[in-house]
Amino acid sequence: KYNIPTAKFGVFNSIQESLLVLNECKFPIVVKADGLAAGKGVYICETHDHSKKAIEEIFNGKFGEAKQILIEEFLKGEEMSFFIISDGVSYKVFGTAQDHKRALEGDRGKNTGGMGAYSPSRLESEKLEKKIIEKVIEPTLKGLKDINNKFKGFLYAGLMIIDDEPFLIEYNVRMGDPECQTILPRLKTDFLDIVIVLFSKLPMVLLKSLLTISTNLRI
């Protein structure tokens, strides 16, 4: 409806329905649990058998009572986490980060909740930020406004950047972890002041970041 660039996808309500679609898929594909999964409900599936196993695990309760799954086109690019804060009227860019989810060296392991991150993303630039705002953030906020949702808080857009173009992979209405552990140390503005402003009628604070790079590693 709002022409936000994303992967081609389908939503499915049963194992049987999902397995029928696999015969038409070009691999690799992405299989996602529709619901909270601590950042672990995404499978990058290289084969039909791997996809079948992922679908069965989700519907059999690995992430709780999943009622739906998403099967998506696999987008090959570089991930970026892009954050804004909104007080329901205006918004400000809160920063970028790059999260590394796969276990083991060389991305050979399974997806995790996050093995580590750094901020800012190495892809960050004024040109790319402008595209993200115009193609993803502002259409999203317009969509929320159109359904009378005055969104207040943090909006985290999980993006795939392909040839300097942003594609939306997911939203979270929170700060990511471990991403927040790399963004917050870079803030010069008091974090409590930011939170107070979000839920009051005070003018949006001026966000200031240190000109540093912050990293986080999980062991």
Regions found by a protein language model. Give the residues of each.
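Conserved, structured core segments of small domains
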Residues: E165-P166, D177, L184-F199
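Short beta-strand
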Residues: V31-D34, E72-E73, S209
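Residue-level signal for inorganic ion chemistry
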Residues: K32, G113, I219
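Short, flexible turn/loop "capping" segments at secondary-structure junctions
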Residues: D34-G35, N111, T212
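A glycine-rich beta-turn/hairpin centered on an aromatic-Pro dipeptide
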Residues: F199-I219
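Residues within well-ordered alpha-helical secondary structure of globular protein domains
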Residues: E24, E57-N60, V197
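Internal nucleotide-binding/catalytic subdomain
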Residues: G41-Q181
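A conserved helix-loop-beta module that forms one wall/lid of the active-site cleft
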Residues: K1-G41
